[in-house]
Amino acid sequence: MASNRCAVCKILNETCAPMCIYAPHFPSNDASFKVIIQIFGAVNVCNILDNLEFPEQREIAANCLRYAAEARIRNPISGCHDMILQYKNILNNVEQDIESAVNELGTYVGHDQVPKFYDLPMPDDFLMTPVSLDSFIAKIKSLNEVQKNQLMQLPTAADNAPMIMNSIFGKMEDKNLKDGHRADGASTSAGK
């Protein structure tokens, strides 16, 4: 029975009940729990997990404690805070790049013609599905030099942009459909 105890019960030298709330999050072979109790203390970890009502909340808390403890070991002075500052800095740089690109595009097509980020059609799961971005990148990579040059020419008005994109990508898809394959390389023959 002693070998089946979870990491928390081993540290606290208690018997591990069959429905122990710590066992799913800190199994007996979990080496990260030693780091967690080194930083937060076993009693504090138990109090945090005991005060949570649902197993999903305990799982999130256990992962957060694990992440924060590892960050504190790597950087004893600032821990997670330093990583948060780094990510905020990256986000600020990206926002500045976007603002710069919008301003530059505005000089070519007019500031009133530049679409706002909330106006752009984008599915809710766009960032979660790599297929949407990968297929677009594959299309761009498969362009010939003439098509790339056409794509790189900025339109004089925002109304011309869809026409240019359709002319480039539409022609490429038509070509790919003639040889029995879509732009992403999949067969259009449906097993015929």
From Swiss-Prot:
<comment type="similarity">
    <text>Belongs to the LOB domain-containing protein family.</text>
</comment>
<feature type="domain" description="LOB">
    <location>
        <begin position="4"/>
        <end position="105"/>
    </location>
</feature>
<dbReference type="Pfam" id="PF03195">
    <property type="entry name" value="LOB"/>
</dbReference>
<dbReference type="InterPro" id="IPR004883">
    <property type="entry name" value="LOB"/>
</dbReference>
<protein>
    <recommendedName>
        <fullName>LOB domain-containing protein 32</fullName>
    </recommendedName>
</protein>
